[in-house]
Amino acid sequence: DDGELYAFITKENAPGHFPYTAGVFPFKRTDELSARMFAGEGEPERTNRRFHYLSQGQDYVRLSTAFDSVTLYGRDPARRPDIWGKVGNSGVSIATTDDAKRLYSGFDLCNANTSVSMTINGPAPIILAFFLNAAIDQQVEAYLAEQGKPAKLLDTAYRGELPEGHNGFGLATVGRRGDEMVDADTYAEIKARTLQTVRGTVQADILKEDQAQNTCIFSTPFALKLMGDVQQYYIDHGVRNHYSVSISGYHIAEAGANPITQLALTLANGFTYVEYYRSRGMDINKFAPNLSFFFSNGLDPEYTVIGRVARRIWAVTMRDMYGADERSQKLKYHIQTSGRSLHAQEIDFNDIRTTLQALL
């Protein structure tokens, strides 16, 4: 009846309409079944081979980068022989821009069908700089090839054989700097175009690190300043397709929080970033679209509505408290099945647990 219809419109609403309880977009994408497997092991070339294996036959390249503990804590593996056993363990070792060039070589980082996720927090601004410079230098390489002046690969560009599907793109600038290979005006043009095109996400959520995971390498105030500096750089250079932070509840849940506490702390962290960025004079509609979220899933009943509640709270607050526009009101998130829920005992049931979480 009319009453039920009114209740649906005001409380449930249709996808793509404020407050986006049922979804921020009116329709589900039909051109892609997104697959983004977390990957990272050993040296950059080894993970690069893994990336190419995972991307075989895929129309859309979705790379999710796992870094080793040495990288997560911002250490230089070349200077620490005492931690040799940790280098490349459970993630890829990245310490230079050349490492990033090798890691993502063979993938056009400016292709509209390519997106890169990087799970890094403490040293996130530095790793992000490696990534962006790798993307820029890729386009310098492409420009030189178009001009009939292809750069010659150095012998040290890539250790080992190129994997299947690897065309060598991105390796010609290994050991070189793109700004030294073209004139200043050309480089500035390539850089501007690259920054406005490159797609992906860097986690960089330092508040949840303090609360749950603790891969902090700076004090919280200084880490927040770095986050603000990165976001201001995004605004100044028109970086619109790359998310400067993935505000994460997953790690909070893995540390022991129930679904309600996970959501409360994650939204609180998100609004803290909003307040901090605004205190630095940033326009909310220029930075809010660069914020993304990441939640854990489990078998608790509250997980069935965690995304719906999050979208609604975010949309109402952004509109009514901050006067944000429609794009800024839309909370976009990724959700992942819980590792904490998996047991060593009766391990065969873990497949069932994960399947049920995925269905939720």
Regions found by a protein language model. Give the residues of each.
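Catalytic alpha/beta active-site cores
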Residues: D1-I306, M321, Q329-Q336
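A generic alpha-helix surface/boundary motif
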Residues: A129, R312-I313
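Flexible, glycine/threonine-enriched loop-and-boundary segments that flank and lead into catalytic domains
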Residues: A315, S338-N350
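Catalytic-core region of carbohydrate-active enzymes that cleave or remodel glycosidic bonds
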Residues: I347-L360
